[in-house]
Amino acid sequence: MFDPFLEELQTGIQARGGISVEVPAGLEHNQSQKGSSTIQSWLWQVPGFRRWRVTRLDAGDSLQVLNSVAYPDFDLDHPLMGVDLLWFGARQKLVAVLDFQPLVQDKDYLDRHFDGLKDLNARFPDLNGEETMRSFDPNQYFSSWLLFCRGGSEEADRSLPKAFSAFLKAYWGLHDEASKEPSSISPGDVERLQNAYDVYSAERDPAHGLFTSHFGKEWSDRFLHEFLFPASQPA
């Protein structure tokens, strides 16, 4: 289901000079004991970004997942990029979240960085985020203009591919524009806010239970704290 999205994302990363770097040992790939699901992850070093991770879960007709988060360099205060796509094939159910994830919620920051996402929100009403996500506070590390959908095969086949391509293009554009302007948040504060994002997300990540059910608690705990949100590890 999501292989074309994965290819588009990683082709774009490589076109921007992205270099694949090593995932923590034992976390780059896993297969469930029953052999019915596999998970594979990639970590990219991309100019302008300190960390860009990608994960693909394939559990056949039961579940397909594509997840990615991009962390800009600390001297850039623009939003993180968050992608979370889930397809439950047996139920023909799509859950999609595409967002520029803000470090802060003040008006000046949002005015500087969110014109592109606002345009996408208007262009793709099927993914306009009116249904609030249940696991997260939409006022912290999520924007009011996120593309969010609980839909079916029509959204998965028609709306999502176009929205995904437009979303990636808009985020690259945001990054290029932000790189030309001085940041309003200091590098030290960007680091603190990105680390707080990891802690916040690790505490609330709805996928952790999903990964645990497929790959066991020990592996999934490592995956959560060492790969998905490494700043959440205890000091």
Swiss-Prot record:
- Primary gene name: pebA
Entry EC no(s): 1.3.7.2
Q: What is this protein called?
A: 15,16-dihydrobiliverdin:ferredoxin oxidoreductase
Question: What reaction is this protein's catalytic activity?
Answer: 15,16-dihydrobiliverdin + oxidized 2[4Fe-4S]-[ferredoxin] = biliverdin IXalpha + reduced 2[4Fe-4S]-[ferredoxin] + 2 H(+)
Q: Does the keyword Oxidoreductase apply?
A: yes
- Annotated Gene Ontology MF terms? 15,16-dihydrobiliverdin:ferredoxin oxidoreductase activity; cobalt ion binding
Function description? Catalyzes the two-electron reduction of biliverdin IX-alpha at the C15 methine bridge.
Q: Which UniProt keywords apply?
A: Oxidoreductase
Question: What organism, scientifically named, is this protein from?
Answer: Parasynechococcus marenigrum (strain WH8102)
Biological processes annotated in GO: phytochromobilin biosynthetic process
Q: Which family does it belong to?
A: Belongs to the HY2 family.
Asked if the keyword Oxidoreductase belongs to this entry, the reply reads yes
Which lineage? Bacteria, Bacillati, Cyanobacteriota, Cyanophyceae, Synechococcales
